[in-house]
């Protein structure tokens, strides 16, 4: 597995090669409300959760990177694409590479997202690059 910074770097290289002006941005640390705001604006969001939203496995792998930094890998971490939500039903819709398109309880999804260090990456189209507020009043307007 890999985490958000590597995905952003790799995705941006690919997007630059395509020449369409899309950008990848690391949203790690942002609230679920911010992620839902991105989805509402047509921007797909890669999120880190646990496989099938199960409780996080406490077992971890530790190592030292070539730069001498400590690194940790959670065994049960998993990436899904957040692609929709229903506030009335309190659900999110994700595209999961293991399960396909699936709905999850929003509260459970948010909990698992937080357990895996609130990692997220958004892919933005050129027309959505202006007004890229995060954690602002604008977010509150779209997601209440």
Q: Which residues fall in each region the model found?
A:
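Short, structured secondary-structure boundary patches
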Residues: 41-48, 69
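Detector for Asparagine
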Residues: 20, 26, 41-43, 52, ...
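Noncatalytic regulatory segments and standalone regulatory/sensor domains
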Residues: 55, 60-76, 83-144
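Structural recognition of the beta-strand scaffold that forms the well-ordered cores
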Residues: 24-26, 45-49, 81, 92-95
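Cysteine-nucleophile protease catalytic domains, especially the papain-like/related folds used
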Residues: 1-44, 117-143
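Generic short beta-strand segments
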Residues: 48-56
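Residues that act as N-cap/strand-start positions at coil-to-secondary-structure junctions
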Residues: 31, 76-79
């Amino acid at each position: 597995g890999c985490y958000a910074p590597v995905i952003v770097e790799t995705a941006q290289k690919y997007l630059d090669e395509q020449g369409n002006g899309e950008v990848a941005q690391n949203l790690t640390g942002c609230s679920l409300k911010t992620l839902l705001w991105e989805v509402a604006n047509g921007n797909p969001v890669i999120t880190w959760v646990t496989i099938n939203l199960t409780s996080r496995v406490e077992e971890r792998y530790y190592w030292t990177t070539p730069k001498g930094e400590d690194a940790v890998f959670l065994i049960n971490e998993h990436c899904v694409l957040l692609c929709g939500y229903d506030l009335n039903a309190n659900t999110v819709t994700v595209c999961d590479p293991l399960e396909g398109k699936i709905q999850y309880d929003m509260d459970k999804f948010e909990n698992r997202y937080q357990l895996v260090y609130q990692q997220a990456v958004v892919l933005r189209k050129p027309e959505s690059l202006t007004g890229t507020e995060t954690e602002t009043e604008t977010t509150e307007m779209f997601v209440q």
